[in-house]
Regions:
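C-terminal "post-core" interaction segments
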Residues: 1-270
């Protein structure tokens, strides 16, 4: 029996929906659609993170179906060797900025899904290079009981370009030690010990009541746009509850990116 297609869903910073895909297979598009339409998810969401790190699967039709959720207009998506799968024109496509997280353990159909989302202009890829295993395969049983798996066809995107064994290079590369990435994947908020700072110096010596939190690019843009003074920027924020900090470098970068896009879009429209 197949496991859950979506293993985790969470809202970060109040309006960024995070969906972790466990495996690309039959039912994934429905699982993503349910998560998106859940009360408290789609309402007021300004960005979406699809985490395809450590995701695999060999159902390329399911990859195309999941990507189709984000495409408004009819266009070719993927050719898995059985003809081109096309997106259908729809009025209910998920139309928010999307960041797709990938790494070396993003394999097969998960790679194809990421590639389609990027090719259609739907998403940006962040993280590390993917496995380069997106291909149609066939298994042959051997006399000794071993099953030999052989690639029989290449996976092609809608424009005819093939997914190669080189893998996908993200639009924004975020280098993370593989062992550390697994730990962050299990708990994005944990702090991994790297250096021993003397007490009273640097971050270790900061006082939580008066320390100004580190600003990301999006917050800096907001403060500049709103014309906040330097004094107000540096003023203590004693009344604000301290929020947990996302330590996962890839996830944190995606949150910064989507927060920035959410701030820029209204400025462009105005």
């Amino acid at each position: 029996m197949a496991g859950p297609r979506v293993s985790k869903a969470e809202v970060f910073q109040g309006d960024i929906l995070y969906i972790r895909v466990a495996q690309v297979g039959e039912g994934l598009s429905e699982a993503i659609a349910r998560t998106w339409s859940n009360p408290g998810s789609a309402n007021g969401v300004n960005g979406l993170i699809l985490d395809l790190r450590y995701a695999g699967g060999d159902d390329y039709a399911a990859a195309a179906a999941a990507a189709d959720l984000f495409v408004k207009k009819e266009q070719p998506l993927l050719d898995c060797g059985n003809g081109i799968v096309r997106a259908q024109t729809k009025s209910n496509a998920i139309c928010v900025p999307v960041a797709v997280l990938v790494n070396r353990q993003t394999t097969e159909a998960a790679e194809a899904m990421a590639a389609v989302l990027r090719k259609t202009g739907t998403a940006l890829l962040l993280g590390g290079k993917t496995a380069g295993q997106a291909q149609v395969t066939q298994e042959f049983p051997l006399k000794n009981g071993v099953r030999l798996r052989i690639a029989t066809a290449m996976i092609q995107l809608g424009d005819g370009s093939a997914l190669t064994t080189e893998g996908l290079t993200p639009d924004i590369v975020v280098a993370v030690n593989p062992a550390e990435e697994q730990k962050y994947f299990a708990d994005a908020f944990q702090t991994l010990a790297k250096t021993n700072l003397p007490v009273g110096t640097g971050i270790a010596g900061a006082t939580p009541a008066t320390r100004r939190p580190r600003l990301n690019e999006a917050e800096l843009m907001r403060e500049r746009h709103e014309g906040l003074s330097e004094a107000s920027l540096n003023a203590p924020r004693e009344s604000e509850p301290e929020q947990p900090i996302v330590r996962d470098p890839v996830l944190a970068r995606a949150l910064d990116l989507l927060r920035g896009l959410a701030l820029v879009r209204p400025m462009i429209r105005s």
